């Protein structure tokens, strides 16, 4: 019994000593800071690809094969933007760019087409009824020089007018009367060379030759010997080949940049070795309703006739705008109804801002308004930040501010 009592007493004494030691240790250990031991409060979980859908616990996204991301209470945005865990932004490769001011450069190629110069276009008519005596061996597509004979014909009205002229000369008609007859012949279409021959020889001519009035290519010629011809019949159509026209359709949005022929570089795949000289250019006023383009017409030297109507060509436009605000095009978020960027403020917060886009070219976008020179915009890794801005309500605040400024 004494041994049992001794054992029990020893156990009780040991427990008291242990309890006392624990109490002393607990009192001696300094309290840890609450901020280091307290866990960050999670508001909800979400899939960055579908930020408007929230979940009450972690796991795999039902939409994508990726883990849900926590939304922490201390990430709630202030009125000026949102904060994001630096680890997340680093993992996503978030990059920024500075808003600059400078000219927006354009270097774009447009398909073009070679065509006849409509200013060098001649229609040959007899302008009086008659019949064809001879047609010279020509057809559509043949090249002719100015003065090349096309056909011989007899015009009874011209023969009659010549008879009147000679009769007045023989009977002492006045100069006014004879000149009136000659003018009538001119108006009726009698060639000037034949009128001079009449005056010189004082003999009636019964056969007349119609000749090409310009150098060019015959584009219409369908007459045969023995045919009757009315005064309004077209004998031939001839179109010049030097210069030719080269036309290209350019978007109406960049038409304002076209100022000078030095901006153009013209090439023809069929003649890559040929240097083309642009005499002048014209931007036609009409806009194609279907394509929203304007026709740019170039007048190009073609003395050697190497350029043929119907050939394909390429027009390179090299130009630059006046200085304006520029950002990388990849920094722009365009939803169709809204264009915005994500800026970075001095405190490192991401702030969405609505912008007005003017034009874009070669990966650079020019802005009308919305930013200032020197601001920082996110140019890579936009998706996560834009999702956070949507979740936190920063986008709604941006829209509200835009609506307030609009009023």
From Swiss-Prot:
- Please give the GO cellular component terms listed in this UniProt entry: cell envelope; membrane; outer membrane-bounded periplasmic space
InterPro entries reported in the protein's UniProt record: CusB-like_dom_1, CusB_D23, HMBD, MFP_Cation_Efflux, RND_pump_MFP
According to its UniProt entry, one GO biological process term is: copper ion export
Record SUPFAM superfamilies: HlyD-like secretion proteins (SSF111369)
Extract the GO molecular function terms from the UniProt entry.
Answer: copper ion binding; copper ion transmembrane transporter activity; transition metal ion binding
Query: What is the annotated signal peptide range for this record?
Result: 1-28
Pfam families documented for this protein: CusB_dom_1, HlyD_D23, HMBD
* Keyword Transport recorded: yes
Q: Keyword set for this entry? A: Copper, Copper transport, Ion transport, Signal, Transport
Outline the inducing conditions.
Answer: Transcriptionally regulated by CusR in response to copper and silver ions.
The miscellaneous comment for this protein is:
The cus system plays an important role in copper tolerance under anaerobic growth and, under extreme copper stress, in aerobic growth.
Q: Tell me, in a sentence or two, what this protein's role is.
A: Part of a cation efflux system that mediates resistance to copper and silver.
Q: Give the matching NCBIfam families.
A: PRK09783.1, RND_mfp
Family of this protein: Belongs to the membrane fusion protein (MFP) (TC 8.A.1) family.
The subunit structure is:
The cus efflux system is composed of CusA, CusB, CusC and CusF.
What is the recorded name of this protein?
A: Cation efflux system protein CusB
Source lineage? Bacteria, Pseudomonadati, Pseudomonadota, Gammaproteobacteria, Enterobacterales
